[in-house]
Amino acid sequence: GQDGYLRPEYVERINGIDSIIKNSDPRVQRFSGYDQLNFLQKIRFKPNENWNLQYSFAYAKTGDAPRYDRLIQYRNGALRFAEWYYGPMKWNMHNLQILHSKKTSIYDDARLTVAYQDYEESRIDRTRANNNRNRQVELVDAISANWDATKTVGKGEIFYGLEYVHNKVGSFGERTNIS
């Protein structure tokens, strides 16, 4: 790889003081890993030939993910950041689909999909020799409902539907003195 991505040294906080430590192997990207968990559950219920109900739940979470390109930045000949990482990302989604396949006066097939998503992510940074840790958090709640239908009319087919989407987005920042 490029020499610019080597890590000859890194910052470690020892007894409340940011200390620059020589890396025994500059090719090792110290403190650059993260963990991740994903989960998916699906359930289907078909009580008869006309109705089909499906529910799914998805969940994902990561641990802290260091921003390696920021942790190797220099300013005035010394490492700029003591900390720079993405905080845990959390996401979950509930999704319910109901399909009705029976000819009525207004449709031949209709599908209702209702979903809810909850998402959170954050960014944390602290410059070297500074006791203030900055944390920026983003929160998103998303609700949606969609109804689609088809109807055969003579030799043609009509497709129509309705949709509602509501996103609530929030963001806040905080500064914490770590000393």
Task: Report the location of each language-model feature.
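Extracytoplasmic loops and strand-loop junctions of Gram-negative outer membrane beta-barrel proteins
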Residues: 21-27, 37, 76-83, 93-94, ...
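Face-selective signature of the C-terminal outer-membrane beta-barrel domain
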Residues: 46-60, 89-179
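Outer-membrane beta-barrel domain signature, especially the mid-to-C-terminal portions
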Residues: 28-30, 68-70, 83, 123-125, ...
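Flexible, surface-exposed loop regions and adjacent strand-edge segments
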Residues: 2-16, 69-79, 126-135, 174-179
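Structural alpha/beta core scaffold segments of enzyme domains
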Residues: 85-87
